[in-house]
Amino acid sequence: MIVKKIFLLLALSSFAFAQVVYEPLHRDVYKFLSRLSQKSVIVFDDQIRPVSRKYIAQKLIEASEKSEQLTSMEKEELEFYSRDFKFEFDIINNIKIDSSQITIAGYDAGDRLRLFSYRNNFFSLNLSPILGYKAGSLDDEKLTHFWNGLYTYGYIDKYIGYSFDFRDNTETGNTIDKTK
């Protein structure tokens, strides 16, 4: 009976797909890649979003290969996003590191500020805080929105990815839609 279960598990595992780390929809990298696509620097298929971080990294690599077509501002943006997607570049290019890299409240190997970052050749973890405040008015009444939380993502080998985005939202004011 156990042999049958093991055989069934192995047979069905061929239909399993690797886990993907998607880039959250509110990130500005989507606008940047869309602009480059409109200029025909790259082809960015983003009709279905979110897209994976690895796909975005591939498009950033394509854009860097055509950097002569970019403005100075676009080159700066490309450099910024390239730092954020360094881990994905390393996975795509199969780059191995000599030892584990740990960053606590500082800049990681990609020169990005992170609360915590860990990476070795088999496992990576990035943890960043989320904090925001927005104040405004609606119908001449004060309205505030405060949010905080954590965003983490990483990879186990190059086949399994994971991400978690937790946010606590607090809205105050007399014009809040409490039914939403």
Where would I find each of the regions flagged by the language model?
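N-terminal, post-signal-peptide region of Sec/Tat-exported proteins
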Residues: 39-79
